């Protein structure tokens, strides 16, 4: 769709000198979302990625110029270049951009420019960001507020991870992995929790990570709002340093928005939220696990503070379809040994894996859990090795894939073979290492039993592998 010159630049009128915006790594979830919003706003968008996929195809159909592979000629005509944190310094497009003195900015800097003219709600934290962002977006949509949202994963009910709305609201996932969330200046900031992760960014110093989160919260104006989980002792330690209005949520007695009487029936949650004015709200949540009740209560708290009515909040949570790759049920399949259910989940930190297993246990009763686990990054495997050993020992059967490197060089003792050895030595489960994923289906058929829940777990290619498995099992 062509846009007139007058229709262009409604969000950021000061960017009138910008004609074409080029994204290096445009296929990434966060990058594609921002590209889609700017494309819909009328900017010329180009971008490159190492592989074609659903996201790049959708952007191309919407009018973006997409290149597969990286080459310096791809930046021709660009007024500004946006880079993903995954892009290396020797990328030919990045090198050429600097040589031609084209401004190069991080993804979060472009998001900050879009947020500058909006009522921004930024969601940060080690776990739960994507789901919480999706929940807030769906509540505001249900309330007919038509928000713009940019999420790090698919918002299933919207069928996309980004949407350009007509209202002043912008709801966005804030990325702490490279500390780029410090560029954002929202009106409301959510912090779901904090644990050591991406420690290379913080020089291995958790205190530095905590200080960075405080800086992020200090980006709020004095009339802004910080929403923090009362169940997280690290966050509660930081509250006195925030210097802004803080509201808390959680199961804790001290929480401003307090969760009581949580029960899980199948893969749904039921609970009551006690509000600061002692109002009691009974919630039906269409996704499982106490961790999702926390995510939903953060969203509820923001909505209540904004004055959104209970009906819109409750309808959005009862109808919530989840975020992409968050306990994503791929279907039930008949195999030689019986019927099994296959679930794909993005969790790749020990805490995330643990809450996924817990939610599956509560929803699946006494059935066995068979996990296909793909470690994500050698550095994370090294830093959290003992935690991975403990949490992966909680399943009934474990298939281990090779580490998904995400561009990292191998680290001795932080590979899948070492992980398998330590898990086996713990004596609770005997993992099977599958390096050739073409053999995965055959290995599964040898070990699965009638009624098993198969969890494909990790942030790398395991999702594509599990979806390929689901397709082959349909035939």
From Swiss-Prot:
Its EC number is 6.3.2.8. Pathway: Cell wall biogenesis; peptidoglycan biosynthesis. Pfam families: Mur_ligase, Mur_ligase_C, Mur_ligase_M. GO terms for molecular function: ATP binding; UDP-N-acetylmuramate-L-alanine ligase activity. Keywords: ATP-binding, Cell cycle, Cell division, Cell shape, Cell wall biogenesis/degradation, Cytoplasm, Ligase, Nucleotide-binding, Peptidoglycan synthesis. The gene is murC. Belongs to the MurCDEF family. It is found in: Cytoplasm. It comes from the Bacteria. It is an enzyme of class 6 (ligase). Cell wall formation. One of its GO terms (cellular component) is cytoplasm. Its main location: cytoplasm. The lineage of its organism: Bacteria, Pseudomonadati, Pseudomonadota, Gammaproteobacteria, Pasteurellales. This is UDP-N-acetylmuramate--L-alanine ligase. InterPro entries: Mur-like_cat_sf, Mur_ligase_C, Mur_ligase_C_dom_sf, Mur_ligase_cen, Mur_ligase_N, MurCDEF_pg_biosynth, UDP-N-AcMur_Ala_ligase_MurC.
């Amino acid at each position: 769709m062509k846009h007139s010159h007058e229709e262009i630049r409604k969000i950021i009128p000061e960017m009138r000198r910008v004609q074409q915006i080029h994204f290096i790594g445009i296929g990434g979830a966060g990058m594609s979302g921002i590209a889609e919003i700017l494309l819909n706003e009328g900017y010329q968008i180009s971008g490159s990625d190492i592989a074609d996929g659903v996201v790049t195809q959708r952007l191309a159909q919407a009018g973006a110029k997409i290149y597969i592979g990286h080459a310096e000629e791809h930046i021709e005509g660009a007024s500004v270049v946006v880079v993903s944190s995954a892009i290396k310094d020797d990328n030919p497009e990045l090198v050429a951009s600097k040589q031609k003195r084209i401004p190069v900015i991080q993804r979060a800097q472009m998001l900050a420019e879009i947020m500058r003219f909006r009522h921004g709600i930024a969601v940060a934290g080690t776990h739960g960001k994507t789901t919480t962002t999706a929940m807030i977006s769906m509540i505001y949509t249900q309330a007919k507020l038509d928000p713009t949202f940019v999420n790090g994963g698919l918002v299933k009910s919207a069928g996309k991870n980004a949407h350009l709305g007509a209202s002043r609201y912008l709801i966005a996932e804030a990325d702490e992995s490279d500390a780029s969330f410090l560029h954002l200046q929202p009106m409301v900031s959510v912090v779901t929790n904090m644990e050591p992760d991406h420690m290379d960014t913080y020089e291995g110093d958790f205190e530095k990570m905590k200080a960075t989160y405080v800086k992020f919260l200090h980006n709020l104006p004095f009339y802004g709002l910080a929403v923090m989980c009362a169940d997280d002792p690290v966050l509660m330690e930081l509250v006195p340093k925030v210097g802004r209005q803080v509201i808390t949520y959680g199961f804790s007695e001290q929480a401003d928005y307090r969760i009581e009487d949580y029960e899980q029936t199948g893969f749904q949650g039921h609970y009551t939220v006690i509000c600061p004015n002692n109002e009691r709200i009974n919630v039906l949540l269409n996704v499982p696990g106490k961790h999702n009740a926390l995510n939903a209560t953060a969203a509820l708290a923001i909505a209540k503070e904004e004055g959104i009515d209970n009906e819109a909040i409750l309808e959005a949570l009862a109808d919530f379809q989840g975020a992409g790759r968050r306990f994503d049920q791929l279907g039930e399949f008949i195999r030689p040994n019986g019927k099994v259910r296959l679930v794909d989940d993005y969790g790749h930190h020990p805490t995330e894996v643990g809450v996924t297993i817990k939610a599956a246990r509560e929803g699946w009763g006494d059935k066995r859990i068979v996990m296909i686990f793909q470690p994500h990054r050698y550095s994370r495997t090294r830093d959290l090795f003992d935690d991975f050993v403990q949490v992966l020992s909680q399943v009934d059967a474990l298939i281990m894939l090779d580490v998904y490197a995400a561009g990292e060089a191998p680290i001795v003792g932080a590979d899948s073979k070492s992980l398998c050895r330590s898990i086996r030595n713990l004596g609770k489960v005997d993992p099977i290492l599958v390096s050739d994923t073409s053999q995965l289906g055959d290995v599964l058929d040898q070990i699965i039993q009638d009624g098993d829940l198969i969890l494909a777990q990790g942030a790398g290619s395991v999702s594509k592998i599990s979806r390929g498995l689901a397709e082959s099992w349909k035939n």
